[in-house]
């Protein structure tokens, strides 16, 4: 069995980790960074850039550079959160045939799952480069408050990326694993994980207990907001800058895609700077131009102003915290430790607010950017059987139920129920001689079904004619360890049954996923070809440079025919380099190597004779040098001497 990697698939940044023995290791990507921006750019020539390279070209390719895609995954186009993002994002969000929110790049619609798969593929490659072996299995994290559709969509993204997703694990739970595993305190400890990331907010109350030498992590409650995070904080700064610039210059930057992309970068930078300083300058020369000429933007932003701009966003995190504490059946005083996760928690005001709410200083010994990936890697080690001293008991974040008479939501599994879990209840028909029942499945806390998230529906047919209330229909709910729901209905009288795995009333079909997996494999093959072509081209260009240089130095020692042969081979090679045929380039490279063989022989012979002459001169001059040797302080050369320590 290969290694199971842990991936934190974040809204703003992603991170990958593995276990080396019992020590977690966060893996640096090809740029040497421990986190990778969750940004994907689609180039005109079909190349896909992921991470820092995609971020660098965002200003000049805004419409085809996708970020914060996690906010769309598993969502319908008509959802109010998606509609809000349509007006804010420089890229186009479109409705897919199944009603999902997809994106449009270079005239082609692609799903949020495919974009997420590109990010996951980069994480997979990062791990493979480090381990030197293929990676096929992963534990991927999601916000605790993700619903069933969002979890399923994340799992699908993993499959498209060529990963078997062994487990979907909640981000706060993963962070608790990373925090609690090496703690030696005896007795049960209750911790609160406050997770404010790039696009989502979660709060979980978790109990860590020692049970016969085994660390047990039991989630008591969870709550949150899947559309609240650092991206919203950035947007508040952007809106403020736009308003200020309009006041000063009379120009509205909100319609300028290029300017917006520069503003986004500047807003994120300013926000980070204000975590360490009281004031920052936002300086963007040539931000736009009008009839009077170019316009420059220079605005001062203080920490106090930023706090005022985002006050309402910070307030929005408090209600879920209070609900989670209440649902866990604990008081604030019962909580031993508060852990901060997610880059946005570096903001001093967030830390102040959390301290005020929980009455204690948040822990500083948890890396908010890496803890989630580390926890996922620990869970991967547990699932692979390499670790047996950890037990994780997670919960379902929202209640699950079915629609019954009058549009009422009848809850089958209540929120914060430990998973995996099963529950069955018997229902009957609403009308005489009813031949079939439609089971409509919902997720949420509202009493009326239509106010909750519709997850899917199916029919149980062939019910024998009978008076209303007579048939006995058993509906069963089964949530697996990934938090994904399977629903069944059975007519107790006839034994007829029907089952579905909830894939939301949209999501990707199996055929679509298979097609996307194939496309991804093709893409991978294309990428490999591209890399091979670039390598062949680089080798050829280096060869041309080297031969040309040698020809300049030793060409006069060659016969005319030999020299012409080399020059012809160089011309042929330069012609081949103008095209994109790898085989032709390699063939011309071989021809050039053969043609320049005589040149190499001349160079070698010349070097040999030079060395021999040098050796003779050195031997002849040694005696004379010794005879004249005497101290000559005025000829001393100052030099730096370094001690080379061995071992």
Swiss-Prot record:
InterPro entries per UniProt: ATPase_NBD (IPR043129), Chaperone_DnaK (IPR012725), Heat_shock_70_CS (IPR018181), HSP70_C_sf (IPR029048), HSP70_peptide-bd_sf (IPR029047), Hsp_70_fam (IPR013126)
Keyword Iron: no
Region (Disordered): 607-647
Residues bearing PTM Phosphothreonine: 200
Biased composition (Basic and acidic residues): 627-647
Induction: By stress conditions e.g. heat shock.
MF terms in GO: ATP binding; ATP-dependent protein folding chaperone; unfolded protein binding
Keyword terms: ATP-binding, Chaperone, Nucleotide-binding, Phosphoprotein, Stress response
Purpose: Acts as a chaperone.
HAMAP family membership: DnaK
Family assignment from sequence similarity: Belongs to the heat shock protein 70 family.
The protein, known as: Chaperone protein DnaK
Gene of this entry: dnaK
């Amino acid at each position: 069995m290969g290694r199971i990697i842990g991936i934190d698939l974040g809204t703003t940044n992603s991170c990958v980790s593995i276990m080396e023995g019992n020590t977690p290791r966060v893996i640096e990507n090809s740029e040497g960074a421990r986190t990778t921006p969750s940004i994907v750019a689609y180039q005109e020539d079909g190349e896909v850039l992921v991470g820092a390279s995609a971020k660098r070209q965002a200003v000049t390719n805004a419409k085809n550079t996708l970020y914060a895609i996690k906010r769309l995954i598993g969502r319908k186009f008509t959802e109010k959160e998606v509609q809000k993002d349509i007006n804010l994002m420089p890229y186009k969000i479109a409705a897919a045939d199944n009603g999902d929110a997809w994106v449009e790049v270079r005239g082609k619609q692609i799903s949020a799952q495919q974009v997420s798969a590109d990010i996951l593929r980069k994480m997979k490659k990062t791990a493979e480069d480090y381990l030197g072996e293929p990676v096929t299995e992963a534990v991927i994290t999601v916000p605790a408050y993700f619903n069933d559709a969002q979890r399923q969509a994340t799992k699908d993204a993993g499959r498209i990326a060529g990963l078997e997703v062994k487990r979907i694990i909640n981000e706060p739970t993963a962070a608790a694993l990373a925090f609690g595993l090496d703690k030696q305190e005896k007795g049960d400890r209750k911790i609160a994980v406050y997770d404010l990331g790039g696009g989502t907010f979660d709060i979980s109350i978790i109990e860590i207990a020692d049970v016969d030498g085994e660390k047990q992590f039991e989630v008591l409650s969870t709550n949150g907001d899947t559309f609240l995070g650092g991206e919203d904080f950035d947007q508040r700064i952007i809106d403020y800058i736009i308003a200020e610039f309009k006041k000063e210059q009379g120009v509205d930057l909100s319609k300028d895609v290029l300017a917006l992309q520069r503003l986004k970068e500047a807003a994120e930078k300013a926000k980070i700077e204000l975590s360490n300083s009281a004031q920052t300058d936002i300086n963007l020369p040539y931000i736009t131009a009008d009839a009077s000429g170019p316009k420059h933007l220079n605005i001062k932003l203080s920490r106090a102003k930023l706090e005022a701009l985002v006050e309402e966003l910070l307030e929005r995190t408090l209600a879920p915290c209070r609900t989670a504490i209440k649902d866990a059946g604990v008081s604030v005083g019962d909580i031993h430790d508060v852990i901060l996760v997610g880059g946005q928690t570096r903001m001093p005001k967030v830390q102040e607010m959390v301290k005020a709410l929980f009455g204690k200083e948040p822990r500083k010994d948890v890396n908010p950017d890496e803890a989630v990936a580390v926890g996922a890697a620990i869970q991967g080690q547990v699932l692979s059987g390499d670790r047996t001293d950890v037990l994780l008991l997670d919960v379902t974040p929202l209640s699950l139920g079915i629609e019954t008479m009058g549009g009422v939501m009848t809850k089958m599994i209540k929120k914060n129920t430990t998973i995996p879990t099963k529950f069955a209840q018997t229902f009957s028909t609403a009308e005489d001689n009813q031949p079939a029942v439609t089971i409509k499945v919902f997720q949420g806390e509202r009493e009326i079904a239509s106010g909750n998230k519709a997850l899917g529906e199916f029919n149980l047919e062939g019910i024998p004619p009978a008076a209303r209330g007579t048939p006995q229909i058993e509906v069963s709910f089964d949530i697996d360890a990934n938090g994904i729901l399977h629903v069944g209905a059975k007519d107790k009288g006839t034994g007829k049954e029907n089952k579905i795995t909830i894939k939301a009333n949209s999501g990707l079909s199996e055929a679509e996923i298979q097609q996307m997996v194939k496309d991804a494999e093709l893409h991978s093959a294309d990428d490999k070809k591209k890399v091979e072509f670039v390598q062949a081209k680089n080798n050829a260009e280096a060869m041309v440079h080297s031969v040309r240089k040698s020809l300049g130095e030793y060409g006069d020692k060659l016969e005319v025919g030999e020299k012409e042969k080399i020059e012809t081979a160089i011309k042929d090679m330069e012609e081949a380099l103008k095209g994109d045929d790898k085989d032709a380039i390699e063939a011309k490279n071989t021809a050039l190597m053969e043609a320049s063989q005589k040149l190499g022989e001349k160079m070698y012979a010349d070097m040999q004779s030079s060395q021999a002459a040098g050796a003779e001169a050195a031997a002849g001059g040694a005696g004379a040098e010794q005879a004249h040797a005497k101290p000559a302080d005025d000829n001393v050369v100052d030099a730096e001497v370094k001690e080379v320590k061995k071992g």
